[in-house]
């Protein structure tokens, strides 16, 4: 039950000279933390990528290019050598060296964080000299250079000084110096963060690279209400909105004072079913877990009318999908990206075969402020599953509450 969603953004058209500029940016969500190794959360990652950098990064056309590493060589299938960029300074003025890469590797792997996925398969990082490191892997990793883009480097000296050697335990609501302060090597430093109010960026004048554009100061404001966010754009209170509600797209396209850019994202939205617990929590089935039976999972998949969601809920701005890899991403295959046919009667038969002729009841936890139309999509799923005899109780909540519940 997956879908590719559309990337929608709009910005106000302003007539201004091309000198340094301030950008007022709004989106639905706030970040969860400033700790770059704590939470694998899209909004948090998209904000922190301007402050903390990795060894590699993406170009505008989604290709890998050097960042804190200037070059690399694959010595063998399981051995990579990276040459580090010299002369790079952290925001506090301290130099970037191989020690920071080793420290960050050991830090990101700590179990209380959720960013370990970006170093999966890397068993060791070795320092060759101050500006050379080797990455040793468990086996061949063809996407290693892409994975480590989000392996962001923190200053070892700064972490030692501020007692930030350990990753914040977000699930336990821990607060640390690194969860409220930053010290990266990126083009922008974060001056202040007021949770649920605003984040203030300033250009890091000591950045090793060259700014693409003239934006020197940025104020990011999370605005949860779709209507309020769009009104702020039309009133000129913000310059850019990066998660437009689909119902306002046509109106904004027709406005002489705004421009809408759109295209499909590489993110895939999916419904996660608990296949771990022997007894399904928050359900009326006791002593067992229906989702462990592949026929039940297939039935719920078969009961979803993706085309109706695309047409009605998403107003044409989504792509039905059968696999996690999106079009445009290396590894996508049209041959296997074939959506299961919508068949509620077939779903009922599968449920009966699995021992649930009368269906069952369970709780569907759903964020209501993270993805475009997330709660409306969940509402549609509840109705579709009901036609197959499965009763889902919708439990929608802010994403800040959703993540700790899922992690726990």
Residue positions per predicted region:
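Aromatic- and charge-enriched surface segment that lines or borders ligand/interaction sites
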Residues: 70-114, 128, 134-139, 229-235, ...
């Amino acid at each position: 039950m997956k879908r590719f969603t559309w990337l929608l953004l709009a910005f106000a058209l302003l007539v201004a000279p091309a000198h340094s500029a301030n950008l007022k940016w709004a989106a639905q969500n706030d970040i969860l933390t400033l700790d770059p190794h704590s939470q694998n959360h899209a909004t948090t990652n998209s904000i922190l990528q301007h402050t903390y950098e990795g060894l590699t990064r993406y170009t505008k056309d989604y290709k890998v290019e050097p960042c804190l590493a200037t070059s690399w060589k694959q010595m063998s299938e399981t051995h990579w050598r990276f040459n580090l960029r010299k002369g790079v300074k952290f925001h506090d003025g301290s130099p970037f060296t191989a020690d920071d890469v080793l420290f960050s590797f050991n830090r990101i792997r700590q179990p209380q964080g959720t960013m370990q996925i970006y170093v999966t398969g890397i068993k060791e990082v070795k320092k060759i000299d101050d500006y050379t490191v080797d990455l040793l892997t468990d086996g061949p990793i063809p996407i290693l250079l892409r994975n480590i883009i989000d392996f962001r480097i923190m200053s070892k000296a700064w972490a030692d000084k501020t007692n930030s050697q350990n990753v914040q335990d977000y699930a336990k609501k821990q607060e640390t110096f690194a969860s409220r302060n930053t010290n990266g090597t990126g083009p922008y430093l974060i001056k202040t963060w007021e949770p649920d109010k605003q984040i203030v960026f300033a250009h890091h004048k000591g950045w090793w690279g060259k700014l693409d554009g003239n934006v020197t100061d940025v104020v990011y404001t999370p605005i949860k209400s779709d209507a309020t966010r769009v009104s702020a754009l039309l009133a000129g209170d913000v310059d850019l909105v990066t998660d437009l509600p689909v119902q306002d797209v046509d109106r904004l396209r027709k406005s002489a004072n705004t421009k809408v850019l759109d295209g499909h994202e590489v993110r895939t939205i999916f419904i996660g079913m608990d296949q771990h617990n022997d007894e399904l929590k928050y359900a009326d089935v006791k002593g067992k877990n229906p989702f462990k039976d592949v026929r039940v999972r297939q039935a719920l998949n078969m009961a979803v009318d993706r085309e109706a969601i695309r047409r009605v809920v998403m107003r044409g701005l989504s792509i039905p999908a059968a696999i996690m890899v999106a079009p445009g991403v290396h590894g996508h295959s049209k041959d296997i990206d074939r959506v299961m046919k919508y068949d509620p009667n077939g779903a009922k038969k599968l449920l009966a075969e699995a021992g649930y002729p009368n269906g069952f009841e369970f709780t569907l936890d759903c964020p209501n402020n993270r993805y475009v139309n997330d709660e409306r999509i969940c509402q549609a799923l509840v109705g579709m599953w009901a036609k197959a005899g499965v009763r889902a109780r919708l439990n929608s909540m802010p994403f800040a509450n959703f993540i700790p519940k899922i992690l726990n």
